[in-house]
Amino acid sequence: MLLPDIALKNSITLLFLSFFLFISCDHKHKEYAKGVLFYSGFPHERELIGEVIELDTALLRYPFRIRIEGDRAIVMDLHGLDHYGHLFQYPGFQYLSSFGKRGDSPTEMLSMENFRLQNHVVWTLDANKSELTRLDFSSSGDSLLRDETVTLDEDILRPLDFAIYNDSMFIIPDYSGENRLCRVNRNGRLIDKIGIIPTIDEKALENARPALAQAWRSFLDYNPNNGILAAVTQLGEVVEVYNLKDSTHIIRIGEHGEPEFKVSDGYGMPTGIMGFSDVQVTDSAIYTVFHGTSFKEIARQSGRLPDGGKYIYVFSLEGEPLCKYVLDHYIYGIWVDEDTKTIIATDVNNDEPILKFNFG
């Protein structure tokens, strides 16, 4: 064969392969509905060094969430021995009191999945009792007192997170698999359901919606100042942004894709990666904690891996990737103060579990 013929043949082959790859990638993206966008990196990346904050108490076993308002900080202990919530003075973190007593009496909690601190009022979620409880600060501000309990509608399947939308409404993920979110009034009654799980797994949509909903478990946060509700998946790498002021919805999928799972006895068993573990919507951005560890690696290490994520991913209020922070600790929960350029985080691996990062 003449050299020109060989060159022509190679050119045609490369052109065909390029066209095939283009069609394949384009087809992959077209499988998703409109409003689904993909990202593979961040325009900025920085390393952050954590400063350990020493506590004057050793109460915390698994500090899962932290929220701060004014001169008060609350840390939620997912596996608390006696109480699930602990109140501290901020920024010194002197221990003040505990709340959310563990037990099965009417005034005690079987579990605490999350809590919200807003306008000097605390709301807690007990999934096992299917209850939301409001607590107010005492006159001294050094303790929290139960004010009311809201029993959730039976149509709301095992709520694992919640956000406060306004004085009359909560938003809770829908674990039936039929929709994405439930809107619930202050009496615990279901108002309606909105959205759908943005998956291309047609088989799961047809035959295993509850398992699909389990795999798509997401953590929520809502900012009433800008009307942005963000949901991030515990498995895979999916960020959903709902603008509740103009009813727009944007979905961003990272390089690890949507949650991967297999169905076993009606339950969704994870097979991909651990994704996000916390999210906070500030006035200007969306901050998330990302793990990115595969379940194969977790099983292979047999508990030797640190628990948590060592990345903080920052997105715009439209879900565009802005910055990736690489941490020197593995963390679970965060609280971000953009005014002071400070991130307070929880580390479940250490006896001193509260960290401070400066990103200014």
Task: Go through each PLM region and give its residues.
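Asp-box/WD-like beta-propeller blade repeats and closely related beta-sheet repeat scaffolds
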Residues: 137-168, 172-173
